[in-house]
Regions:
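Sec-dependent bacterial lipoprotein signal peptides
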Residues: 1-10
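N-terminal leader/targeting segments and the immediate start of mature chains
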Residues: 10-61, 264-274
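Edge/loop elements at the starts and ends of beta-strands within beta-rich repeat scaffolds
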Residues: 35-43, 56-60, 67-72, 150, ...
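One face of beta-strands
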Residues: 43-49, 62-66, 72-78, 85-87, ...
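A mature extracytoplasmic/lumenal domain signature
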Residues: 49, 72, 78-82, 93-95, ...
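An acidic-aromatic
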Residues: 70-130
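C-terminal low-complexity, charged extensions that often adopt amphipathic alpha-helices
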Residues: 109-149, 266-274
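Gly/Pro-enriched, hydrophobic low-complexity segments
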Residues: 146-267
Length: 274
C-alpha cells in the first residue's frame, strides 16, 4: 500500500524543465546578437590553426594574426611556426585581396565571387565565417527572417533570406545557429548553400571575456564581451577541417590604418587561381 501511495504521489509531480535553462524568443535572441555585434568596434588577436585534409594546402600548422574594424574591415595574416609569411587576406566592404607570397600570387575580387576563384580562395572564405563567431557578425539582417526550434538544452535559430533573382516572397535557408540555453551563447553554426546543403559547420568553445562589461542599460549579463577562444570548422564540401585556438584577443583599442591593410589592384578574372 505504501509503495502504491508513493507511486501515485510521484505521478502527480509535474515534469520540471532542467534547472538553469533560460527561455527566450527568436526576437530576444536576435537582439542579443545585435548587442554582441555592437560591443566590438575594433579587435586584434593572435591564434594558431591546425589543418587536416588539405583545407589549406600551403601548411598544416599556421600561426596567425587577425585585425578587425567595424563594420566590415578585416585582415588575416598567416605565418609558419618559424615566422615565414604564408598569406595575407584583406577584406574591406564587399572587396577582398589575397596575397600568397610563397606562390607569387595576388588575387582580388568581390566576396560573392570568391567561390569562382578556385581552391586557393576557399579556405579564406571559411575563415571569415569562423571569425564571425568571435566578432559577433552573425546578427540577423533587415531582410532576413527567423524560425526558433527548442532542442532540449539548446535553441536552434534558422535564418532565412531572399533567394537571389526570385520573387520577394521566396526565401531560402541561409544558416542555423545553436544557442546554449544556460548562457544563450552561440555554440554551433551551420552555413547553408543555395541547394540547401551544409556549406560549413562551425563549433565555438572556451568562451572568455575579452573586455569590460557592456553598458548596464542592457540589463543582461550575457551582453559581456564573451568570445570563443576555440573554433572548429568542418568544410561541408569534404575538403577537410581547421581548428583555430586564440592565444590573445584585445578589443576596442585604436588600430592604425596599416594594421588593416588595403585592397588594391583590379579583380582577378574568375578561375585564374584554380
Amino acid at each position: 500500500m505504501l509503495l502504491c501511495l508513493l507511486i501515485a504521489g510521484c505521478s502527480t509531480v509535474p515534469v520540471q524543465e532542467e534547472a538553469g535553462l533560460k527561455r527566450a524568443t527568436a526576437e530576444e535572441l536576435a537582439s542579443l546578437l545585435r548587442q554582441r555585434e555592437a560591443a566590438i568596434h575594433t579587435m586584434k588577436g593572435l591564434f594558431s590553426a591546425k589543418v587536416r585534409g588539405g583545407l589549406i594546402p600551403i601548411s598544416t600548422r599556421v600561426e596567425g594574426a587577425v585585425y578587425y574594424r567595424r563594420p566590415n574591415a578585416m585582415r588575416l595574416r598567416g605565418f609558419t611556426p618559424i615566422g615565414g609569411e604564408l598569406f595575407e587576406f584583406v577584406q574591406v566592404d564587399d572587396l577582398y585581396m589575397l596575397r600568397l607570397p610563397t606562390m607569387g600570387k595576388v588575387l582580388t575580387g568581390r566576396q560573392l565571387e570568391m567561390g569562382e576563384m578556385g581552391k586557393l580562395a576557399r579556405p579564406f572564405e571559411l575563415s571569415v565565417w569562423a571569425m564571425g563567431g568571435v566578432l559577433g557578425t552573425s546578427a540577423i539582417g533587415k531582410d532576413e527572417t527567423m524560425k526558433l526550434v527548442e532542442e532540449g538544452p539548446r535553441y536552434r535559430l534558422d535564418v532565412f533570406g531572399p533567394r537571389p533573382g526570385a520573387a520577394s516572397t521566396d526565401s531560402q535557408l541561409l544558416r542555423r545557429m545553436w544557442f546554449d540555453r544556460r548562457t544563450l551563447l552561440v555554440v554551433q553554426e551551420e552555413r547553408v548553400n543555395g541547394s540547401g546543403e551544409t556549406d560549413a559547420s562551425i563549433q565555438y568553445e572556451d568562451f572568455r571575456s575579452i573586455g569590460e562589461q557592456a553598458p548596464a542599460a542592457t540589463g543582461n549579463p550575457d551582453s559581456r564581451l564573451l568570445r570563443p577562444f576555440k573554433i572548429s570548422l568542418e568544410d561541408g564540401r569534404g575538403q577537410g577541417s581547421v581548428q583555430v585556438t586564440f592565444h590573445e584577443i584585445i578589443s576596442n583599442q585604436e588600430l592604425k590604418n596599416e594594421d588593416l591593410g588595403r585592397v588594391s589592384g583590379r579583380p582577378s578574372p574568375p578561375g585564374s587561381a584554380s
